[in-house]
Each structure stands twice: as structure tokens, then as C-alpha cells.
Amino acid sequence: MTMSMVKGAGGSHSETKHHGQHHTSVPQGSNTQENTTKSGFRAQVQGFPRGKELAGFIALLLGSAFLFMWELDNNSYGNDFYAAASQAGSKNWTAFLFGSSDWGNTITVDKTPLSLWPSALAIKIFGLNSWSVLLPYALLGVASVAVLWATVRRYAGSTAAFVSGIVLALTPVAVLMFRFNNPDAMLVLLMTCALWAAMRCVETGKWRWAVLTGVFVGLGFLAKQGEVLLIIPALVVLLAVVSPRSWKVKLGQSLATVAAMVVSAGWYIVAVALWPSSSRPYIGGSTNNSIWELTLGYNGFSRLSGNGSAPGGGAGGGPGGAGQGGSASDAAQGAASAASNGTGQAGSSGQMGNMPQGGSPGGGGHGGPTFSGEPSILRLFNEQLGGQATWLFIAALIALVMGIVLCGRAPLKNTKRGLYIGLGVWLLMCAGTFSFMEGTMHQYYTVAMVPPMAGLVGMGAADAWQHRDRLWVRAVSAAAILTSGVTGFGVLRRASDSFPTWLPWVILVATVIGAAGWFALPWMSAAGARRHADGSVPSKLSARVLSLRVAVVGVVAAAMLAGPSAYSAYTIAHANTGSVVAAGPKSDSGMGGPGDGGPGGTAPNAGGTPPNGGNGQGMPGGPNDSGTASDNSSNGMPGGSSDGKGGSSASAGKQRGASSPGGPGQMTVSDTLKSKLKEDSDKYKWSAATIGSQGAASYQLATDTDVMPIGGFSGSDDAPTLDQFKKLVSEKKIHFFIADSGQGGAPGGNNEITSWVKEHFTATTIDGVTVYDLTQEKSS
């Protein structure tokens, strides 16, 4: 019998040849189905955490909960568009099932409704308030941290898991989305769960894990449709390549995953498609009331290409974009100009500002460059995206390469290497898509890349410490420290108005010291340890050496995490409301602007300059406080001031991250207008109707009465038609029409509705808002 020792990932890898048979003992953290011993490392990571590990896990979850819940009500209802849909779902089961914006079931939100259901149930139980709307998403964030921790711990150990959880919890865009009611919080949890289930399938070979993987992906599709597909390549690699099963089993399990995915998502799509359109709400975001078009177009290929029915439509397609005769790029240029020079002024008395000649409020095309800059290989590091998720992106890539190399000659089916590969493919798929997609690219989309980035950083940190005796490991680890610190320095320097001027320099100094100290760890140990008489170093390090090591690790952690921590603290301390949000301070260009069909502002003219009345900081009819770069403000909408925490606005009525035309904000509805809309509201199906879901949502939340969102999110969907609206008015089902919703008119039927109302009913002005009583026609 011969024995050879080969260094592998996680420890020594021994091979024994005996009587012609070859037996392989798998290194720590790398067991396969054939070697699932309950001793040593595997016993530690497969069982429930105990002792210090349990204490660390609890501290991690409590810290995450603190970050995601502290002063959560500062964000009021978050995104009114989704909050109103949750409110509607709490009052009507049909609205709950379809995700209707109103419980009269006029039109749905522009997503499948799974992410709305937790908050709808919370509102039903606890009533409508900030906590019932937002707390479910904070809990989804804590669950995401827990699932990532459990996944990394099982295959890479508790240290890697703890670091991974910290990175996920401190990344600014994750803090933003786990304190907000967009679908992204649920999407992140379900994608992380899908990776966990796939890894369990690779480890055990049991079919139930393959099925569960597909279920998580399918549910993710019902949360945010096409974005969940970003994890599919990683799952394919794990199930079809990394898995140690035979090709027949791998093929069968892959097909089982696909079948489970189709069933768990398809049941809803088919049910809606087969449901009689007369007994369900219009499918928001589609041009023909079709769930298929919403799925494949608006939330599918159009997001990538910028063509078709992407959010905001083409020029002239909805509020806040380029008017007819102007291009989407003109809209973006004009939006940035309005944001940067603060020259846009609100229309007086709650009226819309002047429109550019030849156009009504436009859609803004795909809007990608407006929110996140031009597509390029460096897009993730530009002014708009650099502070969101990519603080440790380069470090994660370095960890990926280092980790795979450290796995050495361990078999491909090695589960630790499999996790490295799965996380790496997921991260690269997100990075490539977000860098080059031509369609609408909001900054907060990047939250989907945070779990794989955090997992790779955590695993890389643990491996770097375990193999710190290797020169090349220390060298690449020092490079990861340097790139992370320099990235943090650059991002904070760009936002110097919002942070102490000394902070980026402290991070830079800590980066240099930390990288040098890490590289010099072996020499520190030899120099600081007490030696025996023969000159040898004892196995137990002296207190001095231990102190040096702790200091080095502390400086490294500060260098890598101080930047994202500062951005996250800023995000927590400032209100985040509206449909265009971003973590950290507002950038001077690109935040908000035309393109996603959101309300607010008017379209630039064909030359790209903001028209008179184009409001860079406020909404039509609301005061314009000329917010500064550090305000991240989008001030009041019709009929309300921008200061005060009433109605559906956040504290101070501020909306961060949307300072240019098209950046939708929240409004504070005056008490007088609230009373008017509530007047005899129990006698009508809708207390009021107005153009666009965003404005309607704010009125609905403020009054707790049903408000019809004509035209849906963009204000341009054909729901209801003019004839349908006339019929509802004649049947006395709508009490008021609010002319100033902040979204204005849109081409087609909705402009016709506004014109018809103005022609047949008398206008009254309430606190700057034009309101028509649809029960009182003009005298002929």
C-alpha cells in the first residue's frame, strides 16, 4: 500500500491505493454523496450551530434586522405604486390574486403579484401603516442573510458564512431594497434559496432537491418575472456539470428542475391567460391586456434590448420622457440638465408645466442611460452604479479564481468548488447583463448580484486566512484588499458633499496598511513570538503576535467595509420613497429622469433642454425647494407641500434618487382634499379617478378610498377606454376626477378622457388641485 498526500481545499487530501482499488478521502468542506461522515468538519457544518458559532449567527441576524428595520417608517409607504396594490389586495381577494392597483380592479401593477402578497396580508391583519407595508420586506432580507449563511457554512465553514452574511447585510443596495417594498427583496431570497437547493442536490443526489430548485426559480418568476433567469446558468452548471451523478441522472434531474419551474410559475400565467378578461382587471404594462405580452415583452426581452413595450414606451409614450419629435436621448440629456442646474420650475396652482411643442408627456424610450449610465464594461463602476453593489466586486472575482485554484486536484464534483463555481457564474451573469443591457436599468437591479458577491468574498476571506502561509495567496489577497479600498476611496470622493472629507483618505490609508500587514503576516509571527532556547518558535503564539494579527484583520475589515457601511448608514438615515430610488447620496447625473413611465416633470423639447415648467426637483403643483445634491429630493406633487409626514409621503416629503423629470415622487394630500375625496365615498365604487397609477396610489393611500388609476403605471394603458369610462360615470360609480395627478395625459384614450371630463363637468380647485365632480354636469 502506498500513500501520497496532496494539498487540497480545506486541508490535506489523502489518496490510498490498496489491492488495485483507488479510495479518495475528500478534503474538509468538500464531501460528496459517497462520503457524508458526521465527524470533524462535516459534523460541525451539517448540524445546528452551537456555542460561539450559534452566538455569532444570532448576532448576525440581529444586526441585519437592525439595519433593515431601524426607523423603517421614515420610508413611509416606500413605493406608493406597490403599496396601493398591497392595500387593494388587503380589501379584495380578486385584487389580491391579480395584483390590482385598486380594489375596484381597473388595472394591475406591471408585475406578477407574488411579492405583494406578504404586505397585503400584513395590512389585512394589522391595518395600513408604514410597518405593515415595509416590515415583510425587511424580514425577507433577514431570511436572505440566513439562507446565504447556511449555504456557505455547509460547504465552506462558519467563518466564510459569517463574513458572507456581513457583506450581504452591509452592501448599500441590499440595505435599500430590504427597507423597501419593491419586488427585489423577495427575488433575492428566492434566488438564494434556489442556489441552496441546487447545492443540496449536487451533494446528495436526491431528486427532491432538484424539484425544490425549480420551485424556487418559478416563484422568483412570479415575484419579478425575467430577472430571476439570471441565476439559471449557475443552476445548469451545478446540476449538469458539477453533480457527480451519471449523465442519465443529471439529465433527469435537470428536466425535473425545469418541469418544477414551469409548473410553479406557469400555473399563474396560464390561469390569468384563460381567465375571462371581462371578470379580471386589465393587465398593466401590456398593450393588449395580455399576460403573455407582459411576460415576454415588457418584463422580458424589452428590458434587455430597450425595444418594444419596455417601461415608459417610446418617445411620447408616457409621462416624463421625450415629447413627440424628441428622442429618448434628448429626454435623458434634458433631464440631466434640469437635475444639475435646478432651473426647472413647477407649474403654478397645481397645473402641469408647459409641454414641449408637438408632444404630450412622453415615455422616454428604454431609459437605461438615464438611470444607470451608458452600457459598457465599466458601467458597474460609473457614478450612478458605483456606490450600489460593486464595492467588493473585484475582490469577489479574485476570490473566485483563488478559491478554484486552492481546490487543487480535488475532483470536479467537490462541493466546495461547486459552490465557488455556482456563485461565480451567478455573479458574472448578473454583471454582464447589467453592464450591457440596453433597456431600463434601475440602480437597484444590482441587488441581484449581492448574494453571490458576498458568498465569494466570505469564502475567499476564509481560504485566504487558512492558506496565509502561501506567498501567492497573500499576494492575491493583498490585491483584493487594495482594489476594494481604492474602489471605496473613489466612490466616497465622488460623494464628498455627503460624507466627511477625511473619510476616503482614512480608508485609503487603512487599505495600504491592511494590505501590507496581510502580506507580512508570517514575518509578524516569527518576529513577535517568544522563541525556545534552540531558536524555534513555539506552537502557541505570544500575546503580542495575537494582538498584531487581530489588528491586521481589523484594519483589513475597515478598509474593505467602511465605504459600503457609510453608504448604508446614509441610506438608513434618509427617506427612500417613490418608484426611482438608489442607495446613498444622489449622483449629479443620471439619477431618476425619463424612461420608466413614472410621473413627474415634463418632457424636454426636441433640442434636449427642459421646457418651461419642466420640474427638476418638484412635481407639478408642488413647491420646488431646489434640492441640493445631498438632498436626493423629489418634492411635493399636486395639492401638497413637500414638508411634513402626512398622507403617503415620507418624512419631509422627500424622495431620494429621483431629481430629474420623470423621477416619480410621493405627495402629501392636504386635509381639505382628503375630506373632499372621502365625501360620500361609501356610495361610489371609486371615490375618484386620475391619470396614472402613481398619483392614484398616493390619493388612495392618503384617503383609504378606492381611486381609479387610469392608464396604469405609465398613464398610457388602454384601461379604461373612453366608452367604458363614460358608462361608469353614467352609472354613478365614480365621484370625482382629479386632473392633476402628476402624470398628466397620455396619447390616445386617456387624453380623450381628460378632454371629455373638462368639456362636460365643472372644475373646482382645492389647495391647488383641479377636481371635477362627475355627478354634476355643466349646465347646457
Which sequence ranges carry the predicted segments?
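Actinobacteria-biased recognition of intrinsically disordered, low-complexity terminal regions
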Residues: 1-53, 59, 327-329, 341, ...
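Short linear, low-complexity motifs centered on an aromatic residue
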Residues: 303-334, 338, 399-403, 461-467, ...
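Membrane-interface segments at or immediately adjacent to transmembrane helices
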Residues: 556-683
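Alpha-helical scaffolding within the catalytic cores
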Residues: 279, 287, 719-728
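Transmembrane helical bundles and short interhelical boundary loops of multi-pass, membrane-embedded
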Residues: 468-590
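Membrane-embedded, lumen/periplasm-facing catalytic core of multi-pass transferases
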Residues: 492-505, 512, 667-687
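Membrane-integral, polyisoprenol-dependent glycosyltransferases
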Residues: 1-308, 324, 333, 342-475, ...
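Aromatic/acidic, Gly/Pro-rich catalytic loop(s) in extracytoplasmic/lumenal soluble domains
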Residues: 575, 641-642, 671-685, 693-706, ...
